[in-house]
Amino acid sequence: MSLPTEVETPTRNEWGCRCNDSSDHITIAAKFIGILHLILWILDRLFFKCIYRRLKYGPKRGPSTEGVPDSMREEYRQKQQNAADVDDGHFVNIELE
């Protein structure tokens, strides 16, 4: 019973990247999808309040207040303003003296 004395080791050119042929259709599609995903993610982060508010309420500015007394409308506006203030509250304003 003899032990193997030679070990197969890959040569340096086998360690190299085999994806140099970037004309492969799958590679091109993956790059395109990746770039598109990045652009959509950036737009979503920039405009998430506008997008989701529009999806929730449609093209109008908010839920309808038809038939609601003025006092309740004002109370609703105050709640909405307070909710917007709380939502923006995760940003820290540092004032230097």
From Swiss-Prot:
<keyword id="KW-0564">Palmitate</keyword>
<dbReference type="GO" id="GO:0020002">
    <property type="term" value="C:host cell plasma membrane"/>
</dbReference>
<dbReference type="GO" id="GO:0015078">
    <property type="term" value="F:proton transmembrane transporter activity"/>
</dbReference>
<feature type="region of interest" description="Disordered">
    <location>
        <begin position="58"/>
        <end position="89"/>
    </location>
</feature>
<feature type="lipid moiety-binding region" description="S-palmitoyl cysteine; by host">
    <location>
        <position position="50"/>
    </location>
</feature>
<keyword id="KW-1182">Viral ion channel</keyword>
<feature type="site" description="Seems to be involved in pH gating">
    <location>
        <position position="41"/>
    </location>
</feature>
<dbReference type="GO" id="GO:0005216">
    <property type="term" value="F:monoatomic ion channel activity"/>
</dbReference>
<keyword id="KW-0735">Signal-anchor</keyword>
<feature type="site" description="Essential for channel activity, possibly by being protonated during channel activation, and by forming the channel gate and the selective filter">
    <location>
        <position position="37"/>
    </location>
</feature>
<feature type="modified residue" description="Phosphoserine; by host">
    <location>
        <position position="64"/>
    </location>
</feature>
<keyword id="KW-0812">Transmembrane</keyword>
<dbReference type="GO" id="GO:0140321">
    <property type="term" value="P:symbiont-mediated suppression of host autophagy"/>
</dbReference>
<keyword id="KW-0449">Lipoprotein</keyword>
<feature type="transmembrane region" description="Helical; Signal-anchor for type III membrane protein">
    <location>
        <begin position="23"/>
        <end position="43"/>
    </location>
</feature>
<keyword id="KW-0945">Host-virus interaction</keyword>
<protein>
    <recommendedName>
        <fullName>Matrix protein 2</fullName>
    </recommendedName>
</protein>
<keyword id="KW-0325">Glycoprotein</keyword>
<dbReference type="GO" id="GO:0044694">
    <property type="term" value="P:symbiont genome entry into host cell via pore formation in plasma membrane"/>
</dbReference>
<feature type="topological domain" description="Virion surface">
    <location>
        <begin position="1"/>
        <end position="22"/>
    </location>
</feature>
<keyword id="KW-0597">Phosphoprotein</keyword>
<comment type="similarity">
    <text>Belongs to the influenza viruses matrix protein M2 family.</text>
</comment>
<dbReference type="Pfam" id="PF00599">
    <property type="entry name" value="Flu_M2"/>
</dbReference>
<feature type="glycosylation site" description="N-linked (GlcNAc...) asparagine; by host">
    <location>
        <position position="20"/>
    </location>
</feature>
<feature type="topological domain" description="Intravirion">
    <location>
        <begin position="44"/>
        <end position="97"/>
    </location>
</feature>
<keyword id="KW-1083">Inhibition of host autophagy by virus</keyword>
<dbReference type="GO" id="GO:0051259">
    <property type="term" value="P:protein complex oligomerization"/>
</dbReference>
<comment type="function">
    <text>Forms a proton-selective ion channel that is necessary for the efficient release of the viral genome during virus entry. After attaching to the cell surface, the virion enters the cell by endocytosis. Acidification of the endosome triggers M2 ion channel activity.</text>
</comment>
<dbReference type="GO" id="GO:0016020">
    <property type="term" value="C:membrane"/>
</dbReference>
<keyword id="KW-0946">Virion</keyword>
<dbReference type="InterPro" id="IPR002089">
    <property type="entry name" value="Flu_M2"/>
</dbReference>
<keyword id="KW-0472">Membrane</keyword>
<keyword id="KW-0813">Transport</keyword>
<dbReference type="GO" id="GO:0055036">
    <property type="term" value="C:virion membrane"/>
</dbReference>
<keyword id="KW-1133">Transmembrane helix</keyword>
<keyword id="KW-0407">Ion channel</keyword>
<keyword id="KW-1015">Disulfide bond</keyword>
<keyword id="KW-0375">Hydrogen ion transport</keyword>
<comment type="subunit">
    <text>Homotetramer; composed of two disulfide-linked dimers held together by non-covalent interactions. May interact with matrix protein 1.</text>
</comment>
<keyword id="KW-1043">Host membrane</keyword>
<keyword id="KW-1032">Host cell membrane</keyword>
<keyword id="KW-0406">Ion transport</keyword>
